[in-house]
Amino acid sequence: MPLTARLQRRIAWFFFPSLLVVSALVLFTVAKRVHAEPKNGTQTLVFLRHAEKPAMGLGQLNCQGLNRALELSEVLPREFGKADFIFAANPSRHVEEGEGDLSYSYVRPLMTVGPSAIKLGLPVNIDFGANDTSELANELMRDKYHNSIIYTAWSHGYLPELISKVAEEASGKAANLVDDWTGDDFDSVVVVTLKWVDGKATLDYKNHKQGLNNGTEACPKST
C-alpha cells in the first residue's frame, strides 16, 4: 500500500471516533432543544363539584345526583367542548359522615363524571386524592395538557384551593379565584382558560351554572 494511502487511512481512523462524538453531541443538542420546546395552545379546565348526595352521605350519590351525572354527559360537552382528559378525586379516600360518623369510600366525584367519561370513551384519572391539590395542579401544568379540554370533579371543600393553586402555578403569582364553595351548591362550574405561548400562560376565569338544579329525585327507570 502506498505511503500516502496508509497515511490517509491512519488519519481517518484517528478522526473517526472524534467525528462520532461530535455527531452524537449535535444530535443530543437538537433533540434536547426539540424536547424542551414548550407546547402552545389553549387549555380549558372545567371544575365541578360532585352531584347531590343522600342525607346519610355514604360517600355516594343519591338518585337526584345520579340524574345530574347523566345530564352532565350532555351538558358538559355541549357547553364547554368535548373533554380530552377527565380527573376525579381518588375514591379510596374515606369520608366520615352521617349518623355515627361512619367511614365510607368517597366515590361521589368519580360517579359524577363517570357517565361523561363513558359517553366520550375516555378513562378517568383518579391518581390524586381530594386533598392532593398541589400535586394535581403540578400535573395539569404539563405540556401534554396545554392544548386540551379537561373535566375535573372534586370535593367542594377542596375545589377553591385546587383552582387557586392551578392559577398560581400557571401565572407564577398568588391567586385566589374562588373564596368558597357553599355546601348547597351542586350547580356551579368554574372554567379556567389558559392560553399558552412559549411556556407562559394568560389566564381567564368564569363561573357558570349547569342549570340542573331541582332535578327529579327518583332514580331513572330501566327500559
Model-derived regions: residue spans:
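Periplasmic-binding protein-like
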Residues: 149-153
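Active-site-proximal alpha-helix that buttresses catalytic centers in soluble enzyme cores
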Residues: 34-147, 158-223
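Hydrophobic alpha-helical membrane-insertion segments, chiefly the h-region
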Residues: 21-31
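N-terminal Sec-pathway targeting helices
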Residues: 4-19
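Short, intrinsically disordered low-complexity segments
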Residues: 5-9, 31-32, 65-67
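Compositionally biased, intrinsically disordered low-complexity regions
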Residues: 7-10, 28, 195-198
